[in-house]
Design a protein with these regions (language model features):
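Carbohydrate-active catalytic/glycan-binding domains of CAZyme proteins
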Residues: 2-3, 9-12, 19-333
Length: 333
């Protein structure tokens, strides 16, 4: 068969299946790393995630996503022996703000392991693999209560933080999603607005949880994914969205998906996909960075199971511009 130039160009322009795109890097990308975030800055990709020991913060860097799989992790900070920041070191996120590097993370105390709050590290070096990481203290919210999973983003010239927190007025110990403008990388401007709480049955399996917000601005909308339910196979993603020109600090600007948008796939042996982040490539394509296990059944507390692994796959969009997460892809090279 003779192929014309037009035919060749059409083939080159045709969408590449998600599984084919994902083959550019291993799946999983990194074993035993939960709550992953990949940040592209300059010519580098940076990866941070929760380590299974919950005792330190690691940073990896590579020229490609695939390179992160074999990049040597550098420990940038270790937990304290006692007091604040001495237990449950979770969900670090790297950000380059106002010409400096910051890590926002969650941590508890050795004597009160569930006294989890938000904390900040800062590094003035232009290279986050160099310089000194300095503790900048607690990033305080409206309440002194269980608080975790901060993510910082900028939109229309304003900086925001979204996070998960327990409202002390609630008796069910649920965690909800909140948002606030930021005065600086270490301080909220206030007030804080509740964007989502566990309303649906799928958000209340094993635990009553909305947590781990992640933000993507795409196609005229601001999307915020979040994770729901317990941390086993029931773990999944929900989705909030607002118009790109809306007031993000007005609850009426936001809509919420009535069902989960990213769930376990027994067919692909992927369970509990969640705590994601979004990575926008230079060409505008979007990747979903998340963790999942390759088995369903867990003995004991899922938080003590080390099987969550970092995974990356392309994110598609429907004809009307909504994210189409698809299923978590089967493991492969």
């Amino acid at each position: 068969m003779t192929m014309t130039r037009r035919t060749v160009l059409a083939l080159l322009a045709a969408p590449v299946p998600a599984a084919a795109q994902a083959s550019a890097w291993p799946n999983p990308l990194v074993s035993q790393r939960a709550d992953p975030q990949i940040l592209r800055h300059g010519e580098w990709y940076y990866l941070m995630a929760t380590v299974p020991e919950y005792d330190r913060l690691e940073l990896r860097r590579a020229r490609s996503i695939a390179g992160l799989a074999t990049a040597e992790p550098q420990v940038v900070w270790r937990k304290h022996d006692s007091g604040p920041m001495s237990r449950h070191i979770w969900a670090p996120e790297l950000a380059f703000l106002d010409g400096r590097w910051f890590v926002h993370f969650s941590a508890g105390e050795a004597r009160e392991p569930w006294k989890i709050r938000l904390w900040v590290l800062e590094n003035a070096s232009p290279d986050p693999m160099q310089g000194e990481w300095t503790e900048r203290g607690q990033l305080k919210t409206q309440w002194e209560s269980f608080t975790l999973d901060a993510t910082v983003f900028e939109h229309r010239g304003r900086r925001y933080m979204a996070w998960a927190q327990t409202d002390p007025a609630k008796k069910n110990h649920s965690t909800d999603i909140f948002i606030s403008r930021m005065k600086s990388p270490t301080e909220l401007e206030g007030p804080q607005l509740r964007l989502s709480q566990p309303d649906y049955a799928w958000e209340k399996v094993r635990h009553i949880v909305n947590e781990a917000p992640a933000v993507l601005v795409h196609g005229g909308r601001v999307f915020m994914s979040y994770s729901a339910a317990g941390t086993g196979a029931e773990y999944c993603l929900g989705l909030l969205w607002a118009d790109v020109n809306a007031d993000l600090m007005d609850a009426k600007s936001w809509r919420k998906s009535p069902g989960p948008v990213f769930v376990s796939s027994p067919e692909n042996s992927q369970y509990g996909p969640g705590h994601n982040s979004f990575l926008v490539e230079a060409d505008g394509s979007v990747l979903n960075v998340f963790h999942a296990r390759n088995y369903r059944d867990i003995v004991g507390d899922p938080l003590k199971d080390n099987g969550r692994a970092t995974r990356v796959q392309p994110l598609a969009f429907t004809a009307d511009g909504m994210p189409d997460f698809g299923p978590p892809l089967k493991e492969g090279p």
